[in-house]
UniProtKB/Swiss-Prot annotation:
Example GO biological process: translation
Gene Ontology CC entries for this record: cytosolic large ribosomal subunit
Entry keyword Chloroplast: no
Entry protein name: Large ribosomal subunit protein uL11
Family statement drawn from the similarity comment of this UniProt entry: Belongs to the universal ribosomal protein uL11 family.
Organism: Francisella tularensis subsp. holarctica (strain LVS)
Keywords in alphabetical order: Methylation, Ribonucleoprotein, Ribosomal protein, RNA-binding, rRNA-binding
Modification note: One or more lysine residues are methylated.
Signal peptide residue numbers: none
Stored CDD domains: Ribosomal_L11 (cd00349)
Length: 144
């Protein structure tokens, strides 16, 4: 069987279990002729066990015959950090105003979740990557 030619790669962030044909999903998939409801049903089925509303980055490969496949990534580090310290948004002045404190244990948990998407050599390197993200959000980092 010949390999199908990829026409487009669409990158979106979709809330777990809440994919529907409204923007931004509908227009992004519609312009490539993809079955929007097919994607929504498949995505919602795959994210059924996840926390509802958690943003999931998804990469959709659209083929020349208008079929598609998609790959889900891990939730953004910023979302996981905000969830760990129970805040709604990052600091407006990250280096001056701190919105909370995160411990090494919490950073390790986040690094384990993010591990498949990170290019870190080991857990310690992954923790440092997540710590950098936390600092850029205005979170005080302890133990790193």
């Amino acid at each position: 069987m010949a390999k199908k030619k990829i026409e487009a790669i669409i990158k979106l962030q979709v809330a777990a279990g809440k994919a529907n044909p409204s923007p931004p999903i509908g227009p992004a998939l519609g312009q490539h002729g993809v079955n929007i409801m097919g994607f929504c049903k498949e995505f919602n089925a795959k994210t059924q066990g996840m926390e509802p509303g958690m943003p999931i980055p998804v990469e959709i490969s659209v083929y020349s015959d208008r079929s598609f496949t998609f790959e889900m990534k891990t939730p953004p580090a910023s979302y996981l950090i905000k969830k760990a310290i129970n805040v709604k948004s990052g600091s407006s002045k990250p280096s001056k105003e701190f919105i909370g404190t995160i411990t090494r244990a919490q950073l390790e948990e986040i690094a384990k979740v993010k591990d498949p998407d990170l290019t870190a050599a080991d857990l310690d390197a992954a923790v440092r990557i997540i710590a950098g993200s936390a600092r850029s959000m205005g979170v005080k980092v302890e133990g790193v």
